[in-house]
């Protein structure tokens, strides 16, 4: 937690199912507000949300989560949602490192919750860490295969990137 240890307030924004080519498509929209320090990393496989997001938030590999926190791990065969324990997983990581950070966790999956979140941003500034998961790109990705209208709007990779840019 180097930034938090330095006293910085952090907004960790995770855009689910956001690809590198999509990032490159929208980066210039944010450039006037932010500076970027980019580094490429590799990911665990599979990159399925259940494994990747739970690992990011816990700071552990999936097998470690299952062993250390079985009450927070949902098996692949289960009908239960696989990412319902993200906030508790963040808490476990903070506690494992013996930190006392204040944090909030928000998962945005529709425009109404997005508006609500924007309205409470001033109160979030009191937290040292704020985690925000944006699900639009993931929903768009799934709709691209399941919804004829979205399939027609995003017929090619370039069109898909353009649709992502429009959302931004």
Residue ranges and their predicted role:
Residues 35-49, 160-167:
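A generic structural motif
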């Amino acid at each position: 937690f180097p930034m938090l240890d330095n006293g910085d307030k952090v907004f960790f924004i995770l855009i689910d199912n956001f690809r590198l080519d999509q990032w490159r498509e929208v980066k210039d929209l944010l450039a006037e507000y932010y500076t970027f320090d980019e580094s490429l990393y590799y990911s665990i496989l599979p990159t399925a949300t259940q494994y990747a997001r739970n690992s990011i938030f816990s700071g552990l590999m999936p097998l470690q989560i299952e062993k250390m926190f079985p009450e927070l791990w949902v098996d692949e065969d289960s009908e239960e949602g696989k990412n319902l324990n993200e906030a508790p997983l963040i808490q476990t990581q903070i506690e494992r490192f013996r930190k006392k950070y204040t944090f909030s966790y928000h998962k945005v999956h529709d425009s109404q919750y997005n508006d609500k979140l924007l309205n409470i941003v001033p109160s979030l500034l009191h937290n040292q860490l704020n985690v925000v998961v944006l699900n639009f790109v993931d929903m768009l990705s799934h709709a691209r295969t399941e919804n004829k209208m979205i399939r027609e709007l995003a017929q090619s990779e370039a069109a898909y990137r353009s649709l992502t840019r429009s959302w931004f």
